Amino acid sequence: MNKIKSLFAAITLATCILAVIPAVAQSTSEAQSAASLAVVMEFLANTAPDKVEAAAERLAAPDATYVSLNFDNPELRKILPWTGTNKGPKAFSSLFLQVQDYWKIEDFTVSTKISSGEDVAIFGKFTYRSVAVDQVFTSPFSIHAKVRDGKMTYFQFMEDTYASASSFRQSGSWTVKTSANAAPFTVAAD
């Protein structure tokens, strides 16, 4: 009889432990998701020229990867020199320091924030005015970031690069052929 009671007690204890494990895992995952989102949002809240270097040092891992607009496009880099893949906290801060020389930020609105463990996705829109030619454009944006141990290890920022690069255009046109069956057409500055 004692063996049956001991066996029953062991089964009851095991059942309780197994019931708690998913709840603990879920709360750990939720806590990690919230912490990851908080790191990215803190960085975005501190991108002003007088704050961004300290924020990047504090919130980006030493070997973090920043992908801005594309992996590597030499032609676009001539227009937007921060584009491509760069490494370390300086990649995060130098981008925002350069942007202020090119555009006046008229609006930057986050509309959606999603986090799952170390992954964070941010969506929104911004309106910039080019400093040199006074062209205004509005673009959607998206961010995918990864956060480990309280530091961003990966940050990819995407926007409408046609609109952003066009905000500097003063003249010129392209003749474009988009598909084999389409007639060529011209895209020109307004």
Where are these regions (language model features)?
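Bacterial N-terminal signal peptides that target proteins for export
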Residues: 1-11
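Short, low-complexity N-terminal intrinsically disordered segments enriched in polar/charged residues
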Residues: 21-62, 175-190
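Hydrophobic pocket/interface hotspot
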Residues: 40, 55-56, 64, 88, ...
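A solvent-exposed, acidic/Ser-Thr-rich amphipathic alpha-helical stretch
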Residues: 58, 62-117
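Bacterial N-terminal signal peptides
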Residues: 10-20
